[in-house]
UniProtKB/Swiss-Prot annotation:
Record GO cellular component, one term: bacterial nucleoid
Protein name, as recorded: DNA repair protein RecO
InterPro entries per the UniProt record, alphabetical: ARFGAP/RecO (IPR037278), DNA_rep/recomb_RecO_N (IPR022572), NA-bd_OB-fold (IPR012340), RecO (IPR003717), RecO_C (IPR042242)
Organism for this UniProt entry: Bacillus cereus (strain ATCC 14579 / DSM 31 / CCUG 7414 / JCM 2152 / NBRC 15305 / NCIMB 9373 / NCTC 2599 / NRRL B-3711)
One Pfam short name: RecO_N
Length: 248
């Protein structure tokens, strides 16, 4: 059976001297993998369409196991991302998180649209670190996690938030922050932005400017929470951390 899908390449794996296995997150099927035979040859008709982060239409011969990529038509190569090492690093984090957080052939058009929109914004020049924070926040419910972003994790009141508790699973107000000695102190902007990112429609993203100190706190909160509850190891996250040391 042949299936035509719109999708984005989120992972490629070399297979032999000339082949690649491409993993595509598609609008129609969710995550699907297929053998792209001969795609490592420069003159192959599958060479360009099987590149990481390529957005296109793909014709896949489906089977009980691994499918075969028959042909593809590029919609966007995301060249703005490919030409910038920092954009590539953040985009790699986003597609790897998508890959690690999803199962094969689980239809999720909402997630496809979120992935596409995030990479599209990145190509348009929106702050890639902010986009990665938004994406990481919005992936929480996909992974079955819902931290207390709206109320204090202990008293469940909407009040002044001064810290984030991984142990309690959310923000803590000033009255209960002392109950977790390992709490992460945060500024008011961190709470407001994480709550906003969790709930808002990504299509409505306008001009966004976030202080570096706020982004750093948000990253600490999210990474620590993911490490405790998710158990996903991302090579791209380590690469990002190394790149950040050299970014001016």
């Amino acid at each position: 059976m042949f299936q035509k899908v719109e999708g984005i390449v989120i992972r490629t794996t070399d297979y032999g001297e000339t082949n690649k296995i491409v993993t595509i997150f598609s609008r129609e099927l969710g995550k699907v993998s297929a053998m792209a035979r001969g795609s490592k040859k420069p003159k192959s008709r599958l060479a360009s369409v099987s590149q990481l982060m390529t957005h296109g239409h793909f014709l896949i011969q489906m089977g009980s196991g691994l499918g075969t990529l028959q042909q593809g038509e590029i919609i966007s190569t995301m060249k703005e991302i490919r030409e910038d090492i920092f954009l590539t690093a953040y985009a790699s984090f986003i597609v790897e998180l998508t890959d690690k957080a999803t199962e094969d052939k689980k239809h999720n058009p909402y997630l496809f649209e979120m992935l596409y929109q995030t990479l599209h914004y990145m190509c348009e020049g929106v702050d890639p670190e902010v986009l990665s924070l938004i994406y990481q926040t919005k992936m929480l419910p996909v992974l079955g996690m819902r931290p207390y972003f709206d109320t204090c994790a202990i008293c469940h009141q909407e009040t002044d938030f001064v810290a984030f508790s991984v142990r309690e699973g959310g923000f803590l107000c000033s009255r209960h922050a002392e109950q977790d000695p390992y709490r992460i102190p945060v500024g008011e902007a961190v709470h407001k932005l994480l709550r906003l990112f969790f709930h808002f429609d990504l299509h409505r993203l306008g001009n966004v400017s976030v202080k570096d100190s706020t982004k750093k706190q948000m990253r600490l909160v999210l990474n620590t929470y993911y490490d405790e509850y998710c158990g996903i190891y991302l090579k791209s996250r380590r690469f990002l951390e190394q790149l950040d040391k050299f970014q001016i």
